[in-house]
Amino acid sequence: MFGGQTIIPIDRMEPPFWVTDYSLQQRYFSIFHITSETTPGYVQALHKFAPSHLIGYPSILAVLAYHILELGLPAPALKVIICNSEQVLEHQRKLMVEAFKCPVIETYGMAEITAAASECTAGTLHTWPEAGILEVYHPEEAVYVNEKGIEGDFVMTGLLNPDMPLIRYRNGDRGSLPDWEARCECGRSLPRFGSIQGRTKDLILTADGRKLYILDSIFNGLPIVEAQLIQESLSSFVVKLVPLDHTGSSLAELDAK
């Protein structure tokens, strides 16, 4: 699994860059340490664990696939790669298929499970109606959209969590309503997902060519309200912070960091 969890210290410079949950037979790989130099270790760990499939962010798995192809490494035999959290771009799919020699399946979902969809063998995203009710809100007009093809903010009501139901929850994604009438050549009658714009993820590019994602982990544990990281060049960054208070304790802790 290649997700956004910080599973090992960010400043670790030597493998292992992964941890294993033997009770669930799952291995979690750090996405923050993937480089051309560390990729052989990742591939060796994958071969040793011998998974049937990979789950992770397509942007990360595409970088891993690129390095595998760049170095001419033999990838492990997989049945499928399941991508989540981001849309799968065509160049990412091509890289993963070429490197791992297996199908790539796109999914849509979130930890709150207020909506979900998965890609069928025909390449169509089908929604899972049992996960929740998906609506589209047009913020400029301040109305809910009832027509197919009109994009707006996703508004979701989850149906799977009776303990903490989320009602008309806006998760920040945008797109259009599912199509309940269209039929897919795969034979499934589940509605076809409308367009998904999704959210974009920021990254920084280092001087040695690495791409670093999930930048919010940099600010974990700091006494701040919000933060902004601006990259001006490969070696120059501007960090803007709003402390919890301006009286002394928060400022002193930030100065110490």
Task: Describe the residue ranges of each PLM region.
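Active-site glycine/GP-rich loop and adjacent strand/helix microenvironment
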Residues: 21-257
